[in-house]
């Protein structure tokens, strides 16, 4: 691949395939990670852990990965939408590369939160000192996980703001669409930033992915609920 040609391209088309491929791989990694975690849990039954505790942990993992999939699909849709309708520039190409790199870090961070939270939840095999250390580690990893979404939404917002600023198109409908989308992304950014701060105080264990769940549910809200109504005011 000739990077200079892609970075200097006058349209976003060369990036579409790369975007689709990267986000598809990220989602595939989530699909691979979930069965691995479930197998780990099932093996604990032989060590004397109750079936109810294992079943509860499995349900938590399934919900956690569902919310992660919702968020990654949201990023994919926003990013691809931008590249599909906007003229490419060196700035947008470089920011896109950074976003894709950050996106590739999401699966391992999600896996680590799930992996260590299941150890914390099934605490029969850990003493109090180990639990305290594990709790601190989960909080750090969770902050990194939510922090990735904060940075990615911020970079997406920067892409839209820059396009609004430099766009020479006279199509008012196009500019309004950019403006409306950028404001919706700004609410996602603020929500993720708020949850990053709140995640420092939310318990771990079965509630480890609660910030991720809140963020995913926020993205599922209709834009009219928090976007266009506020924009119109």
Stretch-by-stretch model annotation:
Residues 2-233:
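Multi-pass alpha-helical transmembrane bundle typical of ion/small-solute transporters
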């Amino acid at each position: 691949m000739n990077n200079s040609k892609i970075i200097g391209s006058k349209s976003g088309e060369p990036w579409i395939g790369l975007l689709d491929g990267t986000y598809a791989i990220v989602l595939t990694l989530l699909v691979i990670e979930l069965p691995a975690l479930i197998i780990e849990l099932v093996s604990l039954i032989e060590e004397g852990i109750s079936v109810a505790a294992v079943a509860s942990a499995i349900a938590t993992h399934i919900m956690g990965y569902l919310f992660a999939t919702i968020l990654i699909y949201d990023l994919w849709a926003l990013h691809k939408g931008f590249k599909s309708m906007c003229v490419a520039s060196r700035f947008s190409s470089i920011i896109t590369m950074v976003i894709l790199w950050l996106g590739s870090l999401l699966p391992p961070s999600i896996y680590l939160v799930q992996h260590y939270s299941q150890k914390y939840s099934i605490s029969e095999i850990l003493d109090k000192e180990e639990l305290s250390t594990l709790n601190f580690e989960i909080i750090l990893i969770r902050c990194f996980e939510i922090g990735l979404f904060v940075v990615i939404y911020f970079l997406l917002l920067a892409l839209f703001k820059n396009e609004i600023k430099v766009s020479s198109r006279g199509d008012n409908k196009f500019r309004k669409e950019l403006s409306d989308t950028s404001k919706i992304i700004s609410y996602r950014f603020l929500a993720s930033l708020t949850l990053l701060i709140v995640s420092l105080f939310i318990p771990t264990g079965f509630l480890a992915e609660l910030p991720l769940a809140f963020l995913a549910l926020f993205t599922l809200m209709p834009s009219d609920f928090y976007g266009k109504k506020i924009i119109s005011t």
